[in-house]
């Protein structure tokens, strides 16, 4: 019987893992009940027999044993569970239940991934959120880890805080006295953020669609708002009620019109909120930051919400229907600390921004700022209290360029050793950072003298112009004089109004004369003329009127354009040689074809006629192949000539030492090039008493210097091709 009971119990346990129909499940339940009854009755019989045998064998005890006192049943919420021995998983969270009088604080644990909560898409609907909320509730894990945090707290809960780019992060929010304390975890002893509620205004923004949340926006004068997401309307009203009670304990004045009860307010009109967007100023770059201990919200989200001000609160809050409850207490305004201030509107040039930094062969985006002649790299704009790297800039050298894949890259070198590799997002950003770094490193290098080998001419001009203007602004803003401010060779080192766009032109006698030379066609400011002694040396050596300042000004892109021009010239020479050899071969083939035709006519009717005809066919096939090769060669040569013409046209601007091939009728001949350099606005400004030649339009000079013929080059090329094909068909 006992063996049958054991086997039956094992069989029922096996059935628990199988799929059963409703009828079989009912039969299984009946068998289980019978088996339990049999086991219970069998157990009582065995126990009675054992007690009787023990009573017969043992002597009588001196006294009756005390009956066992059953342990009192304790509810699961009577005491805190023990701390886990192993470390908590990475995605472990604790969600606090709102604290009520006479109740112990509770929390909800969940192990969902934090990345899912930080997603900016917010695509979970209300039903999914309700399903996730059904989790086991129990007390805080330990008394020393959590009870001190919520001791004397008016309300506490885990709320979502909006970060920049619309991401959300979970914080433990506790209101004690008149302060809002935010903890990253319930085990932290120090709050991550502390916000005094005095002088703040709070706005409740209800959920208007399934993709948004119930939000509480707490705004303090002079700082960006703190946006917290609550789970429901009831929870928002509870927080508003507690905050109102906290206001009553503040020392500041309370405006009765600014604190209506939550129950009397109706939903906010969305159109009315969007109507008053102009009263809210978005953040400088559309991103969040941390100022004065208050985490700012995203710039895009900030533009969609109305920012309540003190003047509006007194006159319009009572008229606006909805859940918007503005509470302003006191006039205290806390100024942001200098450590947390990233940029100021009073600065001419912002010395901070995001850059890509090359670290361990990987590019990472970092928030970079220049302070006290140091380049400080932060992991994020919101984390300014800690930094990753601090690089002293004095004595460093700024070198633009890294490779062709990263054209907007610049490097910092100290004693020839690479200190940092940075990449900007645009040419303006690159020029701004180069100007800032040149000014902070104490370098007297002109931004135009640097080599920009991986960007084109137009982008190089933009980078140089922005770098020079930034360099001037930084030097003008500096309080103390630097060694590179007094250099006369670098006009952009003088913090004057003229230096923003033009150089201070040094004269022969050593005095400075603010003479505005004409700007070039591409908008790049023109450098001044060097002393006459240096000019004579340049004219004697090169035969072209070009000053040293000019050569230094337009040195950007020189290596790249020179290499392109040389490559095109060598390719043109190679194609011309191939064309000449092909022409000679075609002439030889035509002569052989003519001789073969004459030989066929002479040997008509003979045995050698067939061999001669086969040879003539092979010769004609070769002639066709050579002719097709000549046509493709002509097209390639035309393309190379056009590219070379463009490169040489840019050579005038860049001051290249490349001369066109002799014997060509190109408008870039040495004589024309000499005349263009003398008359163009790129040439040096004459500082002598005699008036120099007036600057003329370079484009007009190029247009007038084109060879005037009855037909255009394109038309002549087509006529030449037609004539060649007619001659070929005729032969």
Curated annotation (Swiss-Prot):
List, in alphabetical order, the Gene Ontology terms for molecular function in this entry.
Answer: actin binding; SH3 domain binding
Q: Which taxonomic lineage does the organism of this UniProt entry have?
A: Eukaryota, Metazoa, Chordata, Craniata, Vertebrata
Residues with Phosphoserine modification: 283-284, 549, 665-666, 669, 680, 688
Per the record, residues carrying Phosphothreonine are 676
State where it is primarily located: cytoplasm
Q: Where is this motif: SH2-binding 1?
A: 93-96
- Which residues fall in a compositionally biased region of kind Polar residues? 678-687
This chain's source organism reads Mus musculus (Mouse)
Q: What is the protein's given name?
A: Actin filament-associated protein 1
Residue ranges, compositional bias (Basic and acidic residues): 271-284, 721-731
Q: What keywords would UniProt list here?
A: Acetylation, Actin-binding, Coiled coil, Cytoplasm, Cytoskeleton, Phosphoprotein, Repeat, SH3-binding
């Amino acid at each position: 019987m006992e063996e049958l009971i054991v086997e039956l119990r094992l069989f029922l346990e096996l059935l628990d893992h199988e799929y059963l129909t409703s009828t079989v499940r009912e039969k299984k339940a009946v068998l289980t009940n019978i088996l339990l009854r049999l086991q219970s009755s069998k157990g009582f019989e065995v126990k009675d027999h054992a007690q009787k045998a023990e009573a017969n064998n043992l002597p009588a005890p001196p006294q009756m044993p005390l009956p066992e006192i059953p342990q009192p049943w304790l509810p699961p919420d009577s005491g805190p569970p023990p701390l886990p021995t192993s470390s908590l998983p990475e995605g472990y969270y604790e969600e606090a239940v709102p604290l009520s009088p006479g109740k112990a604080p509770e929390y909800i644990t969940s192990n969902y991934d934090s990345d899912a909560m930080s997603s900016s898409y917010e695509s979970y609907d209300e039903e999914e959120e309700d399903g996730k909320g059904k989790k086991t509730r129990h007390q805080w894990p330990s008394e020393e880890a959590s009870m001190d945090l919520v001791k004397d707290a008016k309300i506490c809960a885990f709320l979502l805080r909006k970060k920049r780019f619309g991401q959300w992060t979970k914080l433990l929010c506790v209101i004690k006295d008149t302060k809002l304390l935010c903890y990253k975890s319930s085990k932290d002893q120090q709050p991550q953020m502390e916000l005094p509620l005095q002088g703040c205004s709070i706005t409740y923004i209800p959920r208007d669609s399934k993709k948004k949340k119930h939000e509480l926006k707490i705004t303090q004068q002079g700082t960006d708002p703190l946006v917290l997401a609550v789970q429901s309307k009831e929870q928002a009203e509870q927080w508003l009620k507690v905050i109102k009670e906290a206001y009553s304990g503040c020392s500041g004045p309370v405006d009765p019109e600014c604190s209506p009860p939550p129950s009397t307010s109706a939903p906010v009109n969305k159109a009315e909120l969007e109507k008053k967007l102009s009263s809210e100023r978005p953040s400088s770059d559309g991103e969040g930051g941390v100022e004065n201990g208050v985490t700012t919200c995203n710039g895009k989200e900030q533009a969609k919400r109305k920012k309540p001000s003190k003047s509006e609160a007194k006159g319009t809050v009572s008229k606006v229907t909805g859940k918007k409850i503005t509470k302003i207490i006191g006039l205290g305004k806390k100024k942001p600390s200098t450590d947390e201030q990233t940029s100021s509107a009073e600065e001419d040039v912002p010395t901070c921004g995001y850059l890509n930094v090359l670290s361990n062969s990987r590019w990472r985006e970092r928030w970079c700022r220049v302070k006290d002649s140091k380049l400080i790299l932060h992991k994020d704009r919101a984390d300014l209290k800690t930094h990753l790297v601090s690089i002293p800039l004095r004595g460093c050298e700024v070198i633009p360029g890294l490779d062709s894949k990263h054209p907007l890259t610049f490097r910092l070198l100290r004693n020839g050793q690479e200190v940092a590799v940075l990449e900007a997002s645009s040419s303006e950003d690159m020029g701004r950072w180069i100007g800032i770094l040149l000014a902070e490193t104490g370098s007297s290098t002109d931004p135009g003298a640097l080599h920009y080998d991986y960007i084109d001419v137009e982008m190089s001009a933009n980078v140089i112009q922005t770098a020079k203007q930034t360099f001037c602004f930084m030097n003008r803003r500096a309080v103390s004089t630097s060694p590179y401010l007094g250099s006369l060779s670098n006009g952009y080192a003088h913090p004057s109004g003229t230096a923003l766009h033009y150089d201070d032109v040094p004269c022969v006698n050593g005095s400075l004369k603010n003479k505005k030379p004409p700007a070039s066609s591409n908008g790049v400011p023109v450098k001044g003329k060097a002393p006459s002694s240096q000019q004579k040396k340049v004219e004697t050596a090169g035969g072209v009127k070009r000053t040293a300042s000019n050569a230094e000004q337009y040195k950007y892109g020189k290596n790249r354009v020179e290499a392109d021009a040389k490559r095109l010239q060598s390719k043109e020479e190679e194609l011309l040689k191939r064309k000449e050899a092909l022409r000679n071969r075609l002439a030889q083939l035509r002569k052989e074809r003519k001789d073969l035709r004459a030989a066929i006519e002479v040997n008509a009717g003979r045995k050698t006629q067939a061999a001669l005809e086969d040879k003539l066919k092979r010769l004609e096939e070769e002639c066709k192949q050579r002719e097709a090769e000549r046509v493709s060669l002509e097209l390639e040569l035309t393309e190379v000539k056009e590219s070379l013409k463009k490169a040489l046209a840019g050579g005038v601007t860049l001051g290249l030492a490349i001369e066109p091939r002799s014997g060509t009728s190109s408008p870039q001949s040495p004589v024309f090039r000499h005349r263009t350099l003398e008359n163009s606005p790129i040439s040096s400004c004459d500082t002598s008493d005699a008036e120099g030649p007036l600057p003329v339009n370079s484009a007009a000079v190029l247009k007038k210097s084109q060879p005037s013929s009855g037909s255009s080059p394109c038309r002549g090329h087509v006529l030449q091709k037609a004539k060649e094909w007619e001659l070929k068909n005729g032969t």
